[in-house]
């Protein structure tokens, strides 16, 4: 098992947000960004998919990123402009971002297993999900399905914990 001392911090690309998070996003943990539509959650995940590739001395983790996209929000053109802002080759940056589009909660859960497989071939240092709960909300409507939905989300969170332990 990994020790707490091996926790690293990933820069968000924002000094203010890094300060709020105590230096950046911790590895070996789950960090959730939530807010209203249009509040910047997707922007943050795009930023992290770029900063994770930076050298450690520049706030990155020198690794690849995986995105499970449940809302069709991934925008390669945003990644390209962010990469250029860091003086990175946009094509190389995009080649280190592995995107899977999940159309329902079962696919979303399966993609965590696929991300773990991918981590055996590449130094995956970030797994992002945009959005964690949207597929579950769309499939489990009404109060009568709340218990079932929460049970499935809990199973998904356990899978995410396994991913953290396996990378």
Named regions from a protein language model:
Residues 10-14, 42, 105-108, 146, ...:
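A conditional alpha-helix N-cap/helix-loop micro-motif detector
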Residues 148-167:
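Substrate-engagement module of ASCE P-loop NTPases
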Residues 60-145, 159:
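Conserved inter-motif catalytic segment of the P-loop NTP-binding fold
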Residues 52, 56, 119, 164:
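Hydrophobic pocket-lining residues that define ligand/cofactor binding sites across diverse proteins
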Residues 1-92:
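The Walker A/P-loop phosphate-binding site
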């Amino acid at each position: 098992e990994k020790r707490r001392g091996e926790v690293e911090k990933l820069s968000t690309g924002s000094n203010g947000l890094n300060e709020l998070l105590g230096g950046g996003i911790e590895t070996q943990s789950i960090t959730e960004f939530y807010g209203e539509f249009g509040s910047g959650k997707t922007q943050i995940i795009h930023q992290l998919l770029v900063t994770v590739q930076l050298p450690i001395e520049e706030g990155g983790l020198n690794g690849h990123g995986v995105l499970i996209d449940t809302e069709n929000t991934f925008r390669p053109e945003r990644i390209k402009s962010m990469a250029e802002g860091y003086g990175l080759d946009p094509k190389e940056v995009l080649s280190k971002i592995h995107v899977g589009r999940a159309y329902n909660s079962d696919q979303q859960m399966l993609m965590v297993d696929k991300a773990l497989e991918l981590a055996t071939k590449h130094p995956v240092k970030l797994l992002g999900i945009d959005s964690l709960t949207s597929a579950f909300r769309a499939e489990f409507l009404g109060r009568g399905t709340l218990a079932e939905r929460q049970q499935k989300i809990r199973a998904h969170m356990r899978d995410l914990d396994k991913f953290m332990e396996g990378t």
